[in-house]
Curated annotation (Swiss-Prot):
Gene Ontology terms: cellular component: mitochondrial inner membrane
KW Magnesium (keyword) present: no
Identification of the protein by name: NADH-ubiquinone oxidoreductase chain 2
Its membrane topology: Multi-pass membrane protein
Matches recorded under Pfam families: NADH_dehy_S2_C, Proton_antipo_M
Localization annotation: Mitochondrion inner membrane
EC numbers, comma separated: 7.1.1.2
Enzyme class: translocase
Function in brief: Core subunit of the mitochondrial membrane respiratory chain NADH dehydrogenase (Complex I) which catalyzes electron transfer from NADH through the respiratory chain, using ubiquinone as an electron acceptor. Essential for the catalytic activity and assembly of complex I.
Quaternary assembly: Core subunit of respiratory chain NADH dehydrogenase (Complex I) which is composed of 45 different subunits. Interacts with TMEM242.
Keyword NAD: yes
Source organism of this protein record: Sylvisorex johnstoni (Johnston's forest shrew)
GO function terms (MF aspect): NADH dehydrogenase (ubiquinone) activity
Gene: MT-ND2
Amino acid sequence: MNPMILLMLLITILSGTSIVMMSSHWFLTWLGFEMNMMAMIPVLMKKYNPRAMEAATKYFLTQATASMILVLGIIINLIHSGQWTIMAMESYSASTLLTIALVMKLGLAPFHFWVPEVTQGVSLNSGLILLTWQKIAPLSLLYQIYSSVNTNILLVMSLLSIMVGGWGGLNQTQLRKIMAYSSIAHMGWMIMIMIYNPNLSLLNLLIYILMTSSMFMLLMFNSTISTLALSRTWNINPIITTTILIILLSLGGLPPLSGFMPKWMIIQELTKNDSVILPAVMAILALLNLFFYMRLAYSSSLTMFPTTNNTKMVWQFQPMNVSFMMTSLISISIMALPLTPLAMILY
């Protein structure tokens, strides 16, 4: 793809998300979603092949269906309230339709089926945009209307997402699918705490974006897309491989890494609201994610292929031209847990 065309598409995606975040009018919100979707489709098809075409088609069908449900909810709310303002939610059916549309765009269970397939069919940099930046616009709109939506629907969908994100990643060998199921589980945690403390949900989103961006950057740096390829990179670039495994454990929420901080704060917030069974169930389901992350770490670093001493020579190692941005993201993704007291004060 021509770099100028790609730059225009990325600017359009940025503009669409910004419009959704800053607008208080339903028409502008819908317009921002459409700009985002139409610019994202060519980005998904950047590498022209049948898998990318199939992934872009699935993405378009899902997002178009969600947009139709969103427009239907907007029209019903307009009939009841007579206003285009986002905060003027006076219809229960409209809020339910809007919730369904937003969780479809986010990829929460039971509307999650498109996320692993689309992520697997596109390149790593397109998957990075899909699993990070594309979550911001639906979450920002849900943040604005969370007080008007049915909390029981969000509760059930978030629990299902945590469960599906754990179970779905157990037998996966493709790293992009593993990251997709990890995204589903993290979205479940964000939506769950949004019911009780929306600001904490934004903190969770920030840490998730940092960890996922670091993971995808390292995979692109290493040109790794499967667990088999990851296990073979140890003899070539052990430092990068070790960093990938540490970030995977951070995504799983293993202390004392950064990924433990949002889970810790979410469970603490739920217990403050006299909820005991719910955080216990969430913590047990989170062990599923941690299990397949630890299994991936074990198979990649502790069970290596038989090699000769010549393969471990210095001349075999690839030069590490790591950027400052990647280094900063990796550092935050691993060592942000000491900032937990400050985060508790702010949120």
